[in-house]
Amino acid sequence: LFHAWSAGGGRGQGEKDVGQYDREDYVFGACAGAGIYRRDFFEQVGIFDEDFFIFAEDVDINMRGQLQGFKCIYLPEAKVYHIGTATVGLYSDRYIYLCKRNDIFVLIRNFSLQMYFRSLWTILKHQFNDIKYFTYRGQGIVLFKSKLDALKMLTPMLFRRFRIQSSRTVSDSKIDPLIIKS
């Protein structure tokens, strides 16, 4: 799944399984811990970007793949067991820092200006909710640092953005239906 504020999500995560995902289907992209990629995908799209380190590196590469016309197929018979935050711990300062910084990287690099402006209200709403939530948890400084450090990387991210956007072969109208707007 891909949310308009640049976060990925697990298909069916937190839902009761009543067979709603028992059929093969096209999806936005795969979790890096579960995806199997063809060699030509990496040759055309590029490899995982080291600037992400962990968290949202798969969202970034999935978006780059979508922008170049690649499709991702969900196979219901595939079973993957992945503890997504085992490395740093769920809601640890490191987790918050990397996730929230990397969300900004995804937006800067991959959204066209039109996509950005169409999603602006959702992006701002989620940014504001993050400020409220993580400040309440005592992690407001960590969140602020993540955004500040993302802005410090603006110049190299804009260069990457130019490369990504100039190599895209798919219009926003093909990508938009894959993005969850809420």
Language model segments and positions:
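A cytosolic small-molecule/anion-sensing beta-strand core signal
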Residues: 31, 63, 76
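Hydrophobic alpha-helical membrane-insertion segments
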Residues: 15, 66-67, 91, 111
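Active-site-adjacent helix/loop segment of glycosyltransferases
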Residues: 72-162, 166-167, 173-177
